[in-house]
Amino acid sequence: IYMFINNPNAYVTTLIISGILTFVCALLAMSVPKASMIAGTLYCLFEGIFIGVLSLLAEAVVGGVVITAVLGTISVVLVVSVMYITGLVKVTQGFYRFLFMFAVGFMVCMLLLLLFSFFPVFSGLFNNFGVVLLVSIISLFLASLYLFFDLKQAQNIVESGSPKEFEWMAAFGIAYTILWIYVQILRIAVMFS
């Protein structure tokens, strides 16, 4: 915190560096099972720095949003866990297909929004409260669905007696999704404050 008070540019530098390192570690952890223990741990370290700085900035702008985001994240994780454990939501092949189609559709939509942002006619699209809120809510819903997927994947890995590196991969997936949920809730909390 001392570093940020004396040098405000450190916020941006820290966000950029930790963001890049987070991205690299995430790619490694997802694509190379044997590297998932180290890459997943480093991902959590760098993502922790990234989210810490992001939360510090959000709290400086709007007091109280971080605790709201933390409590919201805990609530979502608890609800999803209870729904998964009790069998209210079953992760079947149909669920996987829906999740895949929904995720691909969301990514295509986000790419189209990005492309539209390059044209002056659509320049106000990303500043539109309704559009940003809708994107955040859909992203939060998608992250919640991925948490069901991650829990099922972890259960399958444990039950099948897969090697330890796959357990690390499942743990990485759960951590990644919970942090995704936190960022989306933080974003929504800032918007409504």
Outline where the language-model segments fall.
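A hydrophobic alpha-helical transmembrane-helix feature that marks the membrane cores
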Residues: 1-193
